[in-house]
Amino acid sequence: MRIAVDGMGGDHSPSAVVEGCVQALEEFKDIEIYITGPEDLLKEAFSKFKYDKERVIFIDAKEVISTNEHPAMAVKKKKDSSLVKALRLVKDNQCEAVISAGSTGAFLTGCTLIVGRIKGVERPALAPVMPGKNGPFMIIDAGANVDSKPSYLVQFAKMGEVYFKSVMDVNNPKVGLVNIGEEEEKGNDLTKATYKLLKEEKDINFIGNVEPREVSTGDVDVLVCDGFVGNTVLKMYEGVASTILSMIKSEVKSSFLAKLGVPFLAPALMNLKKKMDYKEYGGAPFLGVKGICVKAHGSSDAKAFKNAIRQARKFHENDLIGKLSEEITKKSFDNQKKF
């Protein structure tokens, strides 16, 4: 499998990106890395490690898109940027996947404009998978579409369902709609209209509205919402997780008795920390585009980046894009038959 990597994306690039690539090359013998960025800088970063040089291809790119630039303008103007060149590799079928920890806006815009949407997809969506009490769950959309239509959300539900079936091996994923109450009539015009449409979808296992307090504790696989709500929920969830872990650490240090109990609690606490660590999940797939596009966290370290590569590899193994294309095409055909 050939994976394009934006070597200059993220807060700790290129060092963390390069180290993550080296770790992935060591663990996965069937991948090749096409890394974009200033070639001399990248080669210098790689020189600090031992790696299979035959499986790393350097693509020279002189420009970098920063997080404070206008996404669409930057993608269109900076043709020689590390991000655009990485996306072009997927567009031109030189790579099967692309990963970046850079500007989220530029990445999502570039994926849509350069890689292109799957035929029939109204709007691609960012779909991070998060740790929950009863197992991982997906938030879709988590920020790509701040303003959405009911038909978009129905398609998000379908894409999330396909993901859980093909990647997570869940036969009948439960789909919920994020709302301020469980009752059907609760919410705004968007959620009310979406609820009615989802209820009519016989091939989606729609369980109804899910309140924010049940996001991590409820028995649901796919949480559907517009990008504004999804991004808010995602960042709140990350913040709460970080705060809880910090509070536990402070309490343990606060008394002698608490410190005595650490050896007994350490395994459980370490397991909890691992479950709530975004680094374990690597990145969020951008579903609805023609290639495997994974957005890594901006503050990704080497471990997070390696896991983002692991994710991309798993998506490829499970033919996620092919299954999404098949399902969306089938759905579009079924809708045409109604008229």
From Swiss-Prot:
GO terms for cellular component: cytoplasm. Its main location: cytoplasm. It is found in: Cytoplasm. The keyword Lipid metabolism applies. Its EC number is 2.3.1.274. Keywords: Cytoplasm, Lipid biosynthesis, Lipid metabolism, Phospholipid biosynthesis, Phospholipid metabolism, Transferase. It catalyses: a fatty acyl-[ACP] + phosphate = an acyl phosphate + holo-[ACP]. Transmembrane segments: none annotated. The keyword Cytoplasm applies. Pathway: Lipid metabolism; phospholipid metabolism. One of its GO terms (molecular function) is phosphate:acyl-[acyl carrier protein] acyltransferase activity. NCBIfam families: plsX. Catalyzes the reversible formation of acyl-phosphate (acyl-PO(4)) from acyl-[acyl-carrier-protein] (acyl-ACP). This enzyme utilizes acyl-ACP as fatty acyl donor, but not acyl-CoA. This is Phosphate acyltransferase. It comes from Clostridium perfringens (strain SM101 / Type A).
